[in-house]
Amino acid sequence: MNKNGGPPVANITTSSTTITSTTTTQAKSQLPSSLSVNNLHTTQGSTDQPTILGVTEPISTAPPSSIDFKLSTELENTLISFNLFESPEESRKREEILGKLNQIVREWAKQVSLKKGYPEQTASEVVAKIFTFGSYRLGVHGPGSDIDTLCVGPKHIMRSDFFDDLSDILKVHPEITEFTTVKDAFVPVITMVFSGIPIDLIYAKLALTAIPEELNDLIDESFLKNIDEKSILSLNGCRVTDQILKLVPNIPNFRMALRCIKLWAIRRGIYSNILGFLGGVSWALLTARICQLYPNSAPSTIIHRFFKVYEIWKWPAPILLCHIQEGGILGPKVWNPKRDKAHLMPIITPAYPSMNSTYNVSKSTLQLMKSEFVRGAEITRKIETGECTWKNLLEKCDFFTRYSFYIEIDCYSMNEEDSRKWEGWIESKLRFLISNLESTPKMKFAVPYPKGFTNNLHKANNPDQICTSFFMGLSFNFSNTPGADKSVDLTKAVTEFTGIIKDWLRTQPNPDTMDIKVQYIKKKQLPAFVKDEGPEEPVKTTKKRSSTGEPSATRKKLKSENSDNKLNSPKSPITTNINSTPTTSTPTTTANTTTNTTTATTTTTTTTVPITSTPTSNISSPTMNSTELTTPTSTSTTTSNDSITTPPTTTTINSVQPPSAQPTENGSSTSNSPTSTSINNTALPPNPTTNSESTIETTITLPTTLESQTSTLKDSNEISTNGTAVATEPTITSPSVNINESSTSTSTTTTTTVTEQQIQTAPTTATPINKTIVNTMEVNELSFISSSSETSQSKPPPKKPTISIIRGN
């Protein structure tokens, strides 16, 4: 039996001479005694331990109290209820799979040696070995989690041999499925599923003629000499994992706390290294540092101190488990606070060469993690006083109700192999889109959701197509000053992102089978398959008395009846699409008032832009007709489907000044004093004094000239006899679009599909500007007269916020 209660496996090393495997059990009665809360104070890290771990002395060495043990027992039971501990059968299965994989790489090393001219006897002595790292090595893996593995080979076996010869062996193995190679990754990797267990396999070439059979760890820095940079990066995973286990004072307590922290990060939507949050290693380093500061504390105390410390941590002050070891002139680069001062949240790995494990963190993701630290600190304080439970800490996030606007990125492919490559490539580049969006004026935050979704909404039209969707929440920072500029141009952010995607697509053998579509959507337009990812949005209800005085049945409150008067006019999202056909939509809206009647026709046009493997150079710039936006006074009612509420928040983003309108007796809305828009970024409780919020409506139009013709906002607010303003609802009037004809205004509405052939043959009616197609999205809100105003003069309406996205061809 190994240290964790599982059987040892021959020929499998896990980079440690003291711990050879990391397995846990599922049921509480099956947990090994070393992980039992009742034995936490008797294991490594007792109160008389003189060793000081870390770069500073501990904050407290006090032993756990009886309350700490009680809370730790409750924590353990909560983690078991989330099925975080795998069964002994699955643990044995993992060990068996690792044994098979180890035997495969040994045989592969022999074959490569024979092919390169080594004698039979010498080739038989040349071995390759498998090491584990990551969550499996740390002992915090759960059912269905993957195993991070490292293959170490001698100096004559190249990385090309690993990705060619070994790949050929693995892909035809009967127990291996979903085989994929990612050669151009930061750390080149082979991913596969071996008998139902996901495995990531990387390779490192050591400067040795043969790998010793007795090699059990890779801590010795001599292994880093005379090897390539990719091998150093590959070795770093095992070396960091070993160092973490050596630098924590109590391994069982560390594991229990880390399991909770990882589950919390996943459920709160902040677990993803590739998208700018933190990965498993970074969360382990943060937890290990708290264990150093409180070496004798129980897991429940460690978790509370975790949030308490990082709630007030002054980023970018680095997190260090040990002092950084400087490298020589010719040695590998080591993290330097002066050279790497642009890093926002440095968490430094303890093994030489020290690196920042969080270089992908962005302004938006850091802000969200900070708010989650604050939330966690508040809840854990209440857990200690009995006001909350551990399940309150582990509640799902409200990402899909938190923001008013989202970007949806759909990745299309025609087979599983292409889907894994295409989806992985796009996901790995989303951080560049985030960075570009953050640098856009008026953009405050662009927050990704760290998970892709299988999207089957297209199956009716193309059942063979595979689609994965990613989402980002957007927050804008508009000024409340009347007349202030409220336009946002996302041209650069989007075109640079699509350019990176197309560059890779051109290198693929079948680029025509892989598409991407980007949509800018409102919260109420989110697809149904994301609804299970968080708490349901509350539905406001009201009781209306009948003419007899009896209360009628409860129903959804209409928008026109809401106290905050969220005026909505559903529009279609802007899309950049490959090989899709838009539908024709001709909605007509008629708005009547007591003083005038206005009829407006709305045209919504979707542009379809193919992204092909070869660039086009003869694309003429489209033209644009003037688009008029008229805002008539309206007494029309809004359907209950538009009654979307905004989740509570403590982080507000000043936007335009929306109205706070009350319904009149005839059904129209009268406005009160304007208030600022709150766009939620956290799930914290709202300010109880704030009782009004607004929904920014999105309107998509396709302008067809590049002349100085702009949309006009006509304020038709009507003043009632009592001096209050009557709420008006915007109506969009858009011209028809034909890319092959001169643009003229028309009263009919049409939808044009812009194909690659049409773009190439379109006449040039204006000077080409970057050879792009322009899609303009208008976010409209109204300005109202304060009900307390002494005069009937209305204030100048603020400029409408417009978000322009220019898609490259």
From Swiss-Prot:
One of its GO terms (molecular function) is poly(A) RNA polymerase activity. It comes from the Eukaryota. Mg(2+) 2 binds at D146, D148, D200. CDD domains: NT_PAP_TUTase. GO terms for cellular component: mRNA cleavage and polyadenylation specificity factor complex; nucleus. Mg(2+) 1 binds at D146, D148. InterPro entries: NT_sf, NuclTrfase_I-like_C, PolA_pol_cen_dom, PolA_pol_NTPase, PolA_pol_RNA-bd_dom. It is an enzyme of class 2 (transferase). Its EC number is 2.7.7.19. Residues 1-50, 529-760, 785-809 are annotated as: Disordered. Residues 12-25, 572-655, 666-706, 736-760, 785-794 have a biased composition (Low complexity). GO terms for biological process: mRNA processing; RNA 3'-end processing. Pfam families: PAP_central, PAP_NTPase, PAP_RNA-bind. Keywords: ATP-binding, Magnesium, Manganese, Metal-binding, mRNA processing, Nucleotide-binding, Nucleus, RNA-binding, Transferase. ATP binds at F133, G134, S135, D146, I147, D148, D200, K262, Y271, G280, V281. This is Poly(A) polymerase. It comes from Dictyostelium discoideum.
